[in-house]
Amino acid sequence: MQGSRLVTDLADMHQRCTQSYVRRPYGVGLLIATYDQTGPHLFMTEPSGNFYEYLAMAIGSRSQTSRTYLEREFESFADCSLDELIKHALKALAASLSGDVELDAKSASIGVVGKDSSFQVIDGPPLQPYLDSILVEADAEGTSEQLVADPDA
C-alpha cells in the first residue's frame, strides 16, 4: 500500500468521527513517514481528518521552535547523510525543550525509514554518540546551553 493511500484512509477514519455527536473524535495528530516507488514522504494528520504532506514537520507542545529550525535547515537535507539527518532531528527536538529540560538518551528516540531499509528506532545508548556530536558542535558555536544533558553529570 502506498503511504499516501494509508494516510488518506486514516484521515477519512478521523473525519468520520467528527460527523456524529455520538462518536468521539480522535484527539491526536500523527506524523507518518513512508518510502515508496516515488521516494520519501512525510505526512501530518490532524484530528479533524485533514492531512498534509511536508518535507519536514514537528508537532506537539512547543513545536513552533522546532518547525522554525526545520524551515531554516530543510534545503540542506537532500544532501545530508543519515547521521547528519539524525543530528538535525535531535537539534530540532532540542529547540522545543523548555529551559529546565535537557535532551538525553533516556528521553529521546529517533525513527528511521528509507529505501532498502525497514523502520528502525534508535534510542538509549546507541543514540548517545549523536547527542555527544551535537553538543560538541554547539560548544564550537557557543550555543550549547540547554541543548543536551551531559551523560557523565
Regions found by a protein language model. Give the residues of each.
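Long, low-complexity N-terminal extensions
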Residues: 1-153
